[in-house]
Amino acid sequence: MANQPSAEELKKKLSEMQFYVTQDRGTEPPFTGRLLHNKRDGVYHCLVCDMPLFHSHTKYDSGCGWPSFYQPVSEEAIRYIDDFSHGMQRVEIRCGNCDAHLGHVFPDGPQPTGERYCVNSASLAFSDEKNGDQLKG
């Protein structure tokens, strides 16, 4: 993993919800994330380290309440960890660069992958490919 800022530095940089999600493996309430309904063309990055994670053309409305994607930008973008918390068996997804918690991946997504990367808006930043505008979840 790349050098990650200290917890103190991150607490200054991130909102309380962003810190909770990315550093404490938290989950934002469904249907509340700023990037859930974003339909612009561009790239979704890790909020903590700016690593590109997902292209907008892989985003879709799964109805689950969090931004959903069917494929990351590269194999290196995402780290996968078996998660047995809360009495469930899931696969946690983290940033492949800084290890920030992003969400979980499920095998119920659309083709071509059949996967649903269910990602907290609070873990993402978005860069608009047309005008360079930045949005943070």
Swiss-Prot record:
EC id: 1.8.4.12
Provide the cofactor list for this protein: Zn(2+)
> Where in the chain are disulfide-linked cysteines found?
none
Q: What is the enzyme's main class? A: oxidoreductase
The terms describing its cellular component in GO are: cytoplasm
Q: Which GO terms describe its biological process?
A: protein repair; response to oxidative stress
Q: Which residues bind Zn(2+)?
A: C46, C49, C95, C98
Q: Where is the active site?
A: C118
Catalytic activity from the UniProt record:
L-methionyl-[protein] + [thioredoxin]-disulfide + H2O = L-methionyl-(R)-S-oxide-[protein] + [thioredoxin]-dithiol
Q: Give an example GO molecular function.
A: peptide-methionine (R)-S-oxide reductase activity
* Short name of one Pfam family: SelR
Q: Which domain of life is it from?
A: Bacteria
Instruction: Outline the extent of the MsrB domain.
Output: 7-129
Q: Which UniProt keywords apply?
A: Metal-binding, Oxidoreductase, Zinc
**UniProt similarity note:** Belongs to the MsrB Met sulfoxide reductase family.
Q: Which NCBIfam families match?
A: peptide-methionine (R)-S-oxide reductase MsrB
Kindly provide the name given to this protein in its UniProt entry: Peptide methionine sulfoxide reductase MsrB
What is the native source organism of this protein? Answer: Salmonella agona (strain SL483)
Gene that this sequence comes from: msrB
